[in-house]
């Protein structure tokens, strides 16, 4: 597993992810792209770039509390913010601006929900009700379905950002669902 997320500017993170993807793809083994938060947005942008380059697609995207639009356009984010124990709009918007670098924050490489979603791999999303990124993630799921993508959404109303990685009972269920989706995508244990 390799991780690259919001700690690197978009250009560096996406280029690093592309290099790793090409290297691993050359082996011919099935690939599942997974990311949490900014890493989920990066995985989505990578999948779109792979599609646009005509390269072999990943079998599935698994996106945990995905940050798919760094501008947080969904109006429900305002209502959720007081109940979100981890994220605030001001910080998220500033992180998005910094991550974008010289690109506009609306660019699909930065906010992949604004790009072409047709032809992307099947997706499994894990979305939390107490996460300001949740409304955009749910809207993205509907947009992806409308574009012809197969999308499964696991929604946890009382959970917060990154909940699937924590120690709650709901988290363990989410991790089991991630494992099942991964195994189904790659054809079981090799």
What is each residue range found by the language model?
Residues 1-190:
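Alpha/beta-hydrolase superfamily serine-hydrolase fold, recognizing
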């Amino acid at each position: 597993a390799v991780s690259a997320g919001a700690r690197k500017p978009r250009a560096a993170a996406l280029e690093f992810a592309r290099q790793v993807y090409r290297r691993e793809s050359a082996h011919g083994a099935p690939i599942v792209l997974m990311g949490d938060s900014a890493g989920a947005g990066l995985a989505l942008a990578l999948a779109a770039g792979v599609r646009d380059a005509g390269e072999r697609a990943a079998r599935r995207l698994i996106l945990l509390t995905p940050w798919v639009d760094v501008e947080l356009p969904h109006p429900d984010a305002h209502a959720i913010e007081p109940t979100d124990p981890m994220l605030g709009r001001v910080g998220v918007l500033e992180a998005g601006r910094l991550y974008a670098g010289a690109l506009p924050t609306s660019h699909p490489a930065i906010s992949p929900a604004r790009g072409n979603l047709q032809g992307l791999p099947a997706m499994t999303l894990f979305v939390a009700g107490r996460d300001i990124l949740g409304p955009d993630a749910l809207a993205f799921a509907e947009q992806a379905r409308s574009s012809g993508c197969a999308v499964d959404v696991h929604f946890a109303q009382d959970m917060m950002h990154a909940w699937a990685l924590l120690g709650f009972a709901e988290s363990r269920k989410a991790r089991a669902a991630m494992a099942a989706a991964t195994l189904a995508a790659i054809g079981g244990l090799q």
